[in-house]
């Protein structure tokens, strides 16, 4: 059976009121749920006034109680911009709050302005950090202790 999903790339005019932008985007996901869409994906951008969602976790959490079946995806969490322990915790909490309606999408980031903001301009470093973050997140989820030493340029110890 064919399933429909929606990828939210909520591009809004820069001068549009932020509250109105977010409400419009929320209403779109609520409507998608009522139309039996199976999933809704929201991206993460910090430096774009046109895509005003720095946390898909928080945006999606605002919709849990207003929807019935739709699954919520992060499209994507930019791993080089965040500590993997924070991402692991937020993802696990969201999955539990949504009663399993969570789809975990990760990546190395897509906006040059975000790379500049977080001083992640080197593509090789971003890619290595992303891969290392995935290992760290899986290690956190699959163990009883939070001991992880990163081989990446970010040198995380958890």
What are these model-predicted stretches?
Residues 43, 75, 105-107:
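Structural motif
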Residues 50, 113, 158:
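Conserved protein kinase catalytic core
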Residues 74-82:
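Active-site nucleophile and cofactor-binding loops and adjacent substrate-binding regions
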């Amino acid at each position: 059976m064919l399933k429909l999903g929606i990828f939210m790339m909520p591009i809004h005019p820069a001068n549009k009121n932020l509250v109105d932008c977010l409400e419009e985007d929320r209403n779109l996901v609520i409507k998608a749920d009522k139309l039996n869409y199976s999933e809704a994906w929201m991206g993460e951008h910090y430096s774009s006034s046109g895509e005003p969602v720095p946390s898909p976790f928080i945006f999606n959490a605002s919709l849990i109680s207003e929807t019935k079946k739709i699954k919520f995806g992060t499209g994507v969490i930019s791993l080089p911009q965040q500590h993997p322990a924070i991402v692991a915790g937020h993802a696990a909490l969201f999955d539990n709050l949504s009663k399993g309606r969570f789809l975990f999408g990760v990546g190395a980031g897509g906006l040059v302005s975000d790379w500049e903001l977080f001083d992640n301009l080197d593509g090789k470093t971003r890619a290595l950090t992303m891969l290392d973050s995935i290992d760290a997140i899986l290690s956190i989820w699959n163990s009883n202790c939070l001991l992880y030493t990163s081989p990446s340029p970010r040198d995380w110890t958890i």
